[in-house]
Amino acid sequence: MIWNTNLRWRLPVACLLLEVALIALFGVFVRYDMDADPHWVQEKVIKNLSTDLENEFYYRYPSFQDVHVMIFVGFGFLMTFLQRYGYSSVGFNFLLAAFGIQWALLMQGWLQSFDGRYILVDLENLINADFCVGSVCVAFGAVLGKVSPVQLLIMTLFQVTLFSINEYILLNLLEVKDSGGSMTIHAFGAYFGLTVAWILYRPNLHLSKERQSSTYHSDLFAMIGTLFLWMYWPSFNSAISNHGDAQHRAAINTYCSLAACVLTSVALSSALHRKGKLDMVHIQNATLAGGVGLGTVAELMVLPFGSLIIGFVCGIVSTLGFVYLTPFLESRLHIQDTCGVHNLHGIPGIIGGIAGAVTASIANIDLYGEEGLAYAFGIERSKLNWSPNMQGRFQAAGLFVSLAMALVGGVIVGVILRLPFWGQAPDENCFEDAVYWEIPKEPKSTALRSEDSSIKPPEP
Amino acid sequence: MIWNTNLRWRLPVACLLLEVALIALFGVFVRYDMDADPHWVQEKVIKNLSTDLENEFYYRYPSFQDVHVMIFVGFGFLMTFLQRYGYSSVGFNFLLAAFGIQWALLMQGWLQSFDGRYILVDLENLINADFCVGSVCVAFGAVLGKVSPVQLLIMTLFQVTLFSINEYILLNLLEVKDSGGSMTIHAFGAYFGLTVAWILYRPNLHLSKERQSSTYHSDLFAMIGTLFLWMYWPSFNSAISNHGDAQHRAAINTYCSLAACVLTSVALSSALHRKGKLDMVHIQNATLAGGVGLGTVAELMVLPFGSLIIGFVCGIVSTLGFVYLTPFLESRLHIQDTCGVHNLHGIPGIIGGIAGAVTASIANIDLYGEEGLAYAFGIERSKLNWSPNMQGRFQAAGLFVSLAMALVGGVIVGVILRLPFWGQAPDENCFEDAVYWEIPKEPKSTALRSEDSSIKPPEP
Amino acid sequence: MIWNTNLRWRLPVACLLLEVALIALFGVFVRYDMDADPHWVQEKVIKNLSTDLENEFYYRYPSFQDVHVMIFVGFGFLMTFLQRYGYSSVGFNFLLAAFGIQWALLMQGWLQSFDGRYILVDLENLINADFCVGSVCVAFGAVLGKVSPVQLLIMTLFQVTLFSINEYILLNLLEVKDSGGSMTIHAFGAYFGLTVAWILYRPNLHLSKERQSSTYHSDLFAMIGTLFLWMYWPSFNSAISNHGDAQHRAAINTYCSLAACVLTSVALSSALHRKGKLDMVHIQNATLAGGVGLGTVAELMVLPFGSLIIGFVCGIVSTLGFVYLTPFLESRLHIQDTCGVHNLHGIPGIIGGIAGAVTASIANIDLYGEEGLAYAFGIERSKLNWSPNMQGRFQAAGLFVSLAMALVGGVIVGVILRLPFWGQAPDENCFEDAVYWEIPKEPKSTALRSEDSSIKPPEP
């Protein structure tokens, strides 16, 4: 096989063609929803709204910005742990997310915000587009270091499409609750990415083994990603919840779950090391599993101690996964999972989906109040014969649909990405920025001397 | 003394036991407050609230997230300035804060949000838990590099307990104003930590002197912490202020104070260097003293120029402290204050407490308006014989109580932490990540060459 | 010429004198606006406001904090790309911004918030002060590495003054729309800075050429700045827009423009490299041009696809500028533009101004609705003979005024900064932190060994 990693024509053409197509489609289809349109001034009078604050903007803007930080800084920097792949981690994540949010506005728009003629966008669409791209960032973690930016654009194109369809099935047909996306974002993204990684299996990846580890400073950069994901996860899980108590509860639950998850991740990391030392990989990743695991139930009545339990379990399972499962997946199943997304998003996503099914099936009027139950599950819009038990079964169905879509979609996309002309690098050059980036020469002397002889002494 | 830093059983057992206890206590005691409960839907009708926006969530969520960033990224990265202690700074701060917020929800809950049967939590509890942990992060700065994570968990357990009691005395018994916590958070945290450091005095710490300095990049990581603390401090000081003008005023005052503080910190840093050069330690720390000093008065009528004066003074005092006081404390009083928390939190916290007493004692109807005065000091809830003078004296009393609690508590906790089996390192191994962390090997060649010979040239 | 870079007296005196003057002026002039004053409690009753949420604080606080992050972390870290100038980039940006916001509160206050006796400040003033300082940060980018902190303070003093006058002319006399400041902030700041750089031309700058490049990690630090600017730009462009739909629309438009800009920046960066490799300089800077270009039209009816087109064009033009224009400016016009602000803020700012003139001149009732049009352009406050065409011409006039003010002001300030006693460094010592900062010695061995021989093995 001839490896040609020179993207001089392929990458520019891909970017420009995609963007021109997006502009054309936006021109034909995308308009502002009422509360972002100047006609809102009249609408306020018609709807008898007392204040501009009733504009959706003020309910969701802070959460939106937090989610935005998670996608670009959170995921971007989390993946900078590799010693020579920092530019690509941050830069390709930036590229795929910037493309993905535009395509998601269209795909999700057609399926969910289409008024027959136009897609009407407001802040909720932007949040949902960020969410959709979040699942692509998850999948990127599985193939990190082994694909070209052109492959990433293609993967994003397909994954956003499949994500939107899967989301439509879950939210609109099965009417499941999944406000933080345990199923639609995390489980779907992880298993999609793992399937792609499986198809793209590289038998000689050990040739770039040396670059698969971190350095001292690359691990600190990665902690920037970890912490912004961890801190803003309450916003992630509450961003599109119902106004009022649901948003409030989702934030509290996620806060609790993540706190518990840190303690069990630390515990297991130390217990599984022969000298009791902590492993940065676990601290960077497993501590976040509590946010993933709470994605489905965040706005439901799990109670704070229920959230703690979920975080407790996810921290343990995720750390165990990093120690035992990732090597197993690579050696036995030929799945090379660079960032261990199976441990951070895969299993915790499934746990979240199961927790959602269980929590929904035990919902009752005592716990929620009569109006509260109707409001929480949107029953007035739904079938009359609604029951908690049925909701629970639909939740479980949603999990299976997500996994099935991820596996089938991952196979198809993986096969497309295996075509040899996307500019991928040979196995021995994986995890290396210099393949796709102009890299600065290191300064001759790395020492920054306080009394540099090249500096003229100042006059006294 | 036999030093055993292998935490393989001690750290996991401590984490898991604590977390299991927390889950049990949360299960028995913690429920959602009304505005995070599904019954809120009915409550809105009963209370005749016009909109979901009246949910406390929308008043405080942006401030909460900013405070959250300050605790985890702000304090965490501020301490990464040490050349070989970045993992521990960020990682142990992460661990103790994640444990501390859970324990604080319980302790503060029992004392302040207990309805006789349950602790009812909403967003304000989360903010207060973060605040409480902030004082532990301050104390951590004093002992940074010299304690094991097990010691930190124990210190957090006790300090959160003492903090909650002290806070209860100040806010509920003495009814002082301290919305940004000059007294409860900063002065208490600093003197508690310094007392612990005094008890844990290490006579041979000079053996790890070499690792007590920074490197070029570790200083830049620390600036991430500094800036997020600096930028979000207006949120910190306004997060639990009264709705409306008080929150608004607290943000403006803090913004002003911090801006002034930067100028005087820079001025003093340059003036105190024989060649007029700036010292990163001062820029990283003293610039923040203006936020600490404004913690008590932030929501009071100090006026913008009063805030500037406080910031002006704090910047000067704090920088002087780093240059003259820290060496004095170490050589004469045997207090080894790794991060100089005495200069950043100790003295400015006392200045803040005094400023609060003065500002309260000159409060009057001209300045606040009649309703404004009652609202600002919550007089309707308090004794009828309220007077500004009395309030001022209670404020001063609050400062003394905080200092007394810190000193007494610090001695007790210090003695407990001196027990030899918590996994602490010998003096010559302080400030070293490798004691508790798996550290990556540095790559053989640090040079990242643009034209790496190991990269196959792409086909033309 | 004798170069004396010892600032021991000059910098402290400058900082302290300026701060004392600011405190005096704040004491005489600055008070709280009504919604940050305790009399607000009564005001609510008088104005019949239903809720504390009507306090301006709740409309704008999240946007304010995002803008604050952009100024201090965004601009500060964006400039850390230089290998030996990270302390100065972050530190001097911190210093000039902290001084600038105070001076801007006064200058903008006298011109726009003066009630005859006092400047009444609220959150909007803080945002505007941050905006004003943003233009100084832009200018700083042009002279980065070549000026002393004393020069920066002087530049800030004058630039804030000129900015405020220019802003007054545009917003109050010409009544142009420029909520995100394409003209007032970006074009003004860039051409002011470039003119200063032109006057301060250093013929022997090639002597410090070696330090003008980046290192691997300095580029990652710079990406922190890039991403926080990119992510929070929707807040920047919407922060002072009208309540409701205008803020909402400005956020959506900016989000779209920035996303498109990333794709065209990547495309051009790859296409212009002989091996198709990406250049970090473009990814760090050109990706942001879409935010600059949308500054004037953000709240107008450009529609999402119009925003995409602006972002598309700005990404291309900006990347071309970095490749072709910056070398041309240096070699032919003797303008040494360290950060390439001409490409990121100059040309995109002009594009934004032109887009504003075009968009305003095609405004009509179909697009905005009758009340919407009046509200969007504030027509009720303005002359009766308002027409879109006239608005368009005033917008164009505003752009010319901004450019003229920048060039004339830049010449004057440049001449002042050329005086030889401000502590500037000789050409061969530019881009070097050690001139003004105490720099840590690099540790003897940079290797952090996992099994450090200096660490006593733990007892079994």
UniProtKB/Swiss-Prot annotation, chains A, B, C:
The protein's name in its UniProt record: Ammonium transporter Rh type C
BP GO annotations: ammonium homeostasis; ammonium transmembrane transport; intracellular monoatomic ion homeostasis; regulation of pH; transepithelial ammonium transport
Family affiliation: Belongs to the ammonium transporter (TC 2.A.49) family. Rh subfamily.
Protein's organism: Bos taurus (Bovine)
Membrane topology: Multi-pass membrane protein
GO CC, alphabetical: apical plasma membrane; basolateral plasma membrane; cytoplasmic vesicle; plasma membrane
UniProt topological domain (Cytoplasmic) ranges: 1-9, 83-89, 146-151, 201-219, 273-285, 330-346, 418-460
Record function comment: Ammonium transporter involved in the maintenance of acid-base homeostasis. Transports ammonium and its related derivative methylammonium across the plasma membrane of epithelial cells likely contributing to renal transepithelial ammonia transport and ammonia metabolism. Postulated to primarily mediate an electroneutral bidirectional transport of NH3 ammonia species according to a mechanism that implies interaction of an NH4(+) ion with acidic residues of the pore entry followed by dissociation of NH4(+) into NH3 and H(+).
InterPro entries given in the database record: Ammonium/urea_transptr, NH4_transpt_AmtB-like_dom, RhesusRHD
Reactions it catalyzes: NH4(+)(in) = NH4(+)(out); methylamine(out) = methylamine(in); CO2(out) = CO2(in)
Subunit and interaction comment: Homotrimer.
Superkingdom in the source lineage: Eukaryota
